[in-house]
């Protein structure tokens, strides 16, 4: 079998460890905007998938699940504001460290952070026009993934869009070489490589998602997992 032929489901990212180095973790959160700008392609997702679903004059709501340091919801809030589109974003993460970092950053109009699980919002009967996540799926085990997708279906009124890394030897090699001179003193490079090892191929993901979800390849090394309620499809 070739390199990365199977998911490294037992590999653990350093920043997910409760006893990880706090200084490296804080530096990792500070460096996320740069690495996500370079590899995650969220501006394209906003332009092609999110913005067409937003009402030009509002109201619009978006839930970002597993928001980490908060750079992705911050970026989406700023893009919508630049386009003159009213958008209220709720960003949630159960990790106390991630939440503390996110709320320590300068405030952005229309964006609020909460330390919470998606299941808690489902229990509260909350709904949002759009539900998103970034680089979250590969962190989850099978039961957690099933729960996330169920929660997403219940929470979204127009669409749920999960953007994640797509496993490939080329992605691994390029990320390894491309990040080698950069991101010192953080978990970016080591955890990024672990993320690629843990991530799904598009075919693997398509085989396990429930009916109603679609998986599409996003170049160069990502895929989008999308759900549209039938009443809004």
What label would you give each PLM region?
Residues 165-208:
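C-terminal alpha-helical "lid/dimerization" subdomain adjacent to the S-adenosyl-L-methionine
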Residues 198, 202-229:
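Conserved Class I S-adenosyl-L-methionine
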Residues 140-151:
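A short, conserved alpha-helix within the catalytic core of class I
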Residues 1-30:
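N-terminal, positively charged/glycine-rich alpha-helical extensions of SAM-dependent methyltransferases
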Residues 156-165:
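Conserved beta-strand signature within the Rossmann-like core of class I S-adenosyl-L-methionine
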């Amino acid at each position: 079998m070739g390199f990365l032929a199977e998911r490294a489901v037992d590999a653990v990212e350093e920043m997910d460890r409760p006893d990880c180095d706090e200084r490296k973790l804080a530096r990792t959160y500070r460096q996320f905007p740069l690495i996500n700008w370079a590899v995650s392609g969220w501006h394209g997702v906003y332009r092609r998938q999110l913005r067409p679903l937003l009402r030009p004059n509002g109201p619009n709501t978006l839930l970002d699940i597993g928001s980490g340091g908060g750079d992705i919801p911050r970026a989406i809030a700023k893009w919508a504001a630049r386009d003159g589109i009213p958008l209220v974003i709720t960003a949630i993460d159960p990790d106390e460290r991630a939440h503390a970092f996110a709320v320590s950053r300068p405030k952005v109009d229309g964006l609020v952070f909460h330390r919470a699980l998606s299941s808690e919002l489902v229990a509260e009967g909350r709904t949002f026009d759009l539900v998103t996540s970034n680089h979250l799926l590969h962190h989850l085990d099978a039961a957690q993934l099933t729960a996330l997708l169920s929660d997403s279906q219940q929470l979204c009124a127009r669409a749920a869009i999960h953007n994640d890394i797509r496993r490939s030897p080329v992605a691994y090699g390029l990320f390894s070489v491309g990040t080698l001179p950069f991101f010192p003193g953080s978990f970016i490079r080591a955890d990024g490589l672990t993320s690629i090892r843990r991530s799904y191929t598009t075919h693997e993901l398509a085989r396990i998602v429930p009916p109603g979800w679609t998986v599409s390849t996003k170049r160069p090394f990502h895929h989008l997992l999308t759900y549209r309620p039938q009443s809004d499809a």
